[in-house]
Amino acid sequence: MTYYRVRLPDNSPESQIGCFCLFENARLMADANPGYCVFVDGEKVYPA
């Protein structure tokens, strides 16, 4: 299963504000919180 984590660009676990199974939900959370990105296994996937 893939987990999409919403964090600040430095990918620090302390900055995580959400973890989702669906990319669309993670993207919406990141878009609603300026400065946040979506990560999968430590790699930024959104925004590209």
Spans of features found by a protein language model:
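Short, mixed-charge low-complexity intrinsically disordered segments
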Residues: 31-48
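Short aromatic-glycine-(Arg/Gly/Cys) micro-motifs in beta-strand/loop hairpins
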Residues: 1-16, 36, 40
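Acidic, low-complexity, intrinsically disordered interaction modules
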Residues: 11-12, 17, 21-29, 33-35
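Aromatic (phenylalanine/tyrosine) cluster motif
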Residues: 4, 20-23, 46
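Small/flexible residues
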Residues: 7-9, 29, 46
